[in-house]
């Protein structure tokens, strides 16, 4: 695929490192900003805020603890950024190593960027904690597995029960979207 055929991304994509940048640029035509790890400096946060104001920002970090830490730091400093998520499967290395955007295929990256979520920091929850409990997402023998599969289906990343509630609220996932996802997940169990 040549440069002219690649999907163009207006926003700046925030990634963790230079290998992530290389992989992103294999998949799409986009500018990136590298955090260089989870110890994000105030200067980097200021840059992200400036870029958010001028072009918009997409946070695209690894689906691991450090990636989630970076995502949280950026979200708190610059509310309203967009988010792209890879599944752990899509970010897994072909050999030994840790999960990372740098291991994702160009197709997986494009798919993640096609399903962005924009934060609604002050949004009212559309789904209650009770709804999540009734759906078996916060307790029970399959809760963890259901959350993992829900995160993959909705492309919002893996969460624990508490994080799931916050993420569904933050991204304003509707009850209908949750219902559709759960039907899909539970139908998978029948195969």
Curated annotation (Swiss-Prot):
The keyword Protein transport does not apply. It catalyses: Endonucleolytic cleavage of RNA, removing 21 and 42 nucleotides, respectively, from the 5'- and 3'-termini of a 5S-rRNA precursor. GO terms for biological process: rRNA processing. Mg(2+) 1 binds at residues 16, 62. It is found in: Cytoplasm. Residues 10-93 form the Toprim domain. Its main location: cytoplasm. It comes from the Bacteria. Its cofactor is Mg(2+). The keyword Thylakoid does not apply. Mg(2+) 2 binds at residues 62, 64. GO terms for cellular component: cytoplasm. Binds two Mg(2+) per subunit. Its EC number is 3.1.26.8. Keywords: Cytoplasm, Endonuclease, Hydrolase, Magnesium, Metal-binding, Nuclease, Ribosome biogenesis, RNA-binding, rRNA processing, rRNA-binding. One of its GO terms (molecular function) is rRNA binding. Belongs to the ribonuclease M5 family. Required for correct processing of both the 5' and 3' ends of 5S rRNA precursor. Cleaves both sides of a double-stranded region yielding mature 5S rRNA in one step. HAMAP family: RNase_M5. This is Ribonuclease M5 1. It comes from Ligilactobacillus salivarius (strain CECT 5713) (Lactobacillus salivarius). The gene is rnmV1.
